[in-house]
From Swiss-Prot:
Protein's cellular compartments: Cytoplasm
Family that this chain belongs to: Belongs to the AdoMet synthase family.
The reaction(s) this protein catalyses: L-methionine + ATP + H2O = S-adenosyl-L-methionine + phosphate + diphosphate
Residues that coordinate or bind Mg(2+): D19
Family matches, as Gene3D superfamilies: 3.30.300.10
Region called Flexible loop, residue ranges: 101-111
Function text: Catalyzes the formation of S-adenosylmethionine (AdoMet) from methionine and ATP. The overall synthetic reaction is composed of two sequential steps, AdoMet formation and the subsequent tripolyphosphate hydrolysis which occurs prior to release of AdoMet from the enzyme.
Co-factor(s): Mg(2+); K(+)
Pfam family, one: S-AdoMet_synt_N
Gene that this sequence comes from: metK
Lineage of producing organism: Bacteria, Pseudomonadati, Chlorobiota, Chlorobiia, Chlorobiales
Protein's UniProt name: S-adenosylmethionine synthase
Note on how the cofactor is bound: Binds 2 divalent ions per subunit. Binds 1 potassium ion per subunit.
């Protein structure tokens, strides 16, 4: 029998990528509003470019937040602390253009005290559909390509901030991983792309020689540390700074905006995306909270060994608490003689997907042990610090199918 063979690619970007700088500022602003007032309604967008940060959006809150202070703190934490970067924490301009949220939206979302069930009192913040996904490719139950891509740029940032080796690194970086699959199983890594911003070449060293040093350092200290050795072979291709010199980067090299890295934030293209970005949005916005809940559903279904893959779609109408629809697809991998309809029926009873129930379950209005800024670089999923990654419904799912 012939084997099914194909290639699949995912990419990631570092915390210093301009779009991620914007995401982190937006989420840091959200964190502070929620810290002061857990009932805050926030939709915060950030624009970054050469020497400039603009923060805008809609807010309803009792809190008072120093936007300039937060933006400068985030930029400092990322590492833009030198004037030569043309975007520097202490000297960049910071403009706040936040204003009040529309009362028309408030009317549909805020609590309706006359309704008996408290979880029915809070409507969805908007219409739309959200997706969650899980699979058995990695211990985190995430697609392997995006996990490797995230870990590559995260490792680069760790090395840069430690400052012991590769001291030429600057904050902006991108990664991309191509996997070869045989019969739907990861067989090997076919290609790795890493582009990292760096200092000018040292005096007396040519560009070609400096790029050769960078290539060797990244392969040895980043790629081979992150990617399991058994997946690398003599045919794996390494594209390290493939265009050569990469000195100009960050917001000086490219303008950044909140919400432009939604595939990096999720599953690297291995699963559908409803189109709504996450960062800067409070948890009443189902673009964010329902995507987290959908991941929780999918991950628990896979962790319970009901299927090897699971996609969950949930949809909402603005102002309505209960989902308009829920859809579960195990891509033909359901086990124990189960079908998708059976799994969906049980899941709908076990997982409450009303926005207020989601917020309560994960304490999304009062994060503890994590913050929204943490989500804004290196992925919202596949990281155990986040409550929606818990496999706390496995036993209940198994019991529902008499598998416990």
């Amino acid at each position: 029998m012939s084997q099914s063979r194909y290639f699949f690619t995912s990419e990631s970007v570092s915390e210093g990528h301009p779009d991620k700088v914007s995401d982190q500022i937006s989420d840091a602003v959200l964190d502070e509003f929620l810290r002061q007032d857990p009932n805050s309604r926030v939709a915060c967008e950030t624009f970054v470019t050469t020497g400039q940060v603009i923060v805008g959006g809609e807010v309803t809150t009792k809190g008072i937040v120093d936007i300039q202070k937060i933006a400068r703190r985030v930029v400092t934490e990322i590492g833009y602390t030198k004037g030569e970067y043309m975007f520097e924490a202490n000297s960049c301009g910071v403009l706040s253009a936040l204003h009040s949220q529309s009362p028309d939206i408030n009317r549909g979302v805020d609590r309706k005290e006359e309704i008996a069930d408290e979880f029915d009192r809070v409507g969805a913040g908007d219409q739309g559909m959200m997706f969650g996904y899980a699979c058995t490719e990695t211990p985190e139950l995430m697609p392997a390509a995006i996990q490797f891509a995230q870990q590559l740029v995260k490792k680069l940032a760790e090395i840069r901030k430690e400052g012991k080796i590769m001291t030429y690194l600057r904050p902006d970086a991108k990664s991309q991983v191509t996997l070869e699959y045989i019969d739907d199983k990861v067989a090997r890594v076919d290609a790795v792309v890493v582009s990292t911003q760096h200092d000018p070449e040292p005096a007396g060293m040519s560009e070609a020689d400096f790029q050769a040093v960078i290539r060797k350092d990244i392969i040895e200290n980043v790629v081979k540390v992150v990617i399991p050795a058994e997946l690398l072979d003599e045919n794996t291709k390494f594209h390290i700074n493939p265009t050569g010199r990469f000195e100009i980067g960050g917001p000086h090299g490219d303008t950044g905006l909140t919400g432009r890295k939604i595939i990096v934030d999720t599953y690297g293209g291995a699963a559908p995306h409803g189109g709504g970005a996450f960062s800067g949005k409070d948890p009443s916005k189902v673009d964010r909270s329902a995507a987290y809940a959908s991941r929780h559903v999918a991950k628990n279904i896979v962790a319970a060994d009901l299927a090897d893959k699971c996609t969950v779609q949930v949809s909402y109408a603005i102002g309505v608490a209960r989902p308009v629809s829920i859809y579960i697809d195990t891509h033909g991998t359901a086990k124990h003689g189960l079908d998708d309809a059976e799994i969906q029926a049980k899941a709908e009873k076990i997982f409450d997907l009303r926005p207020a129930a989601i917020i309560r379950r994960f304490n999304l209005d009062r994060p503890h042990g994590w913050c929204y800024q943490d989500t804004a670089a290196y992925g919202h999923f596949g990281r155990d610090i986040f409550p929606w990654e818990k496999t706390d419904k496995v036993e209940e799912l198994k019991k529902a199918f008499n598998l416990a």
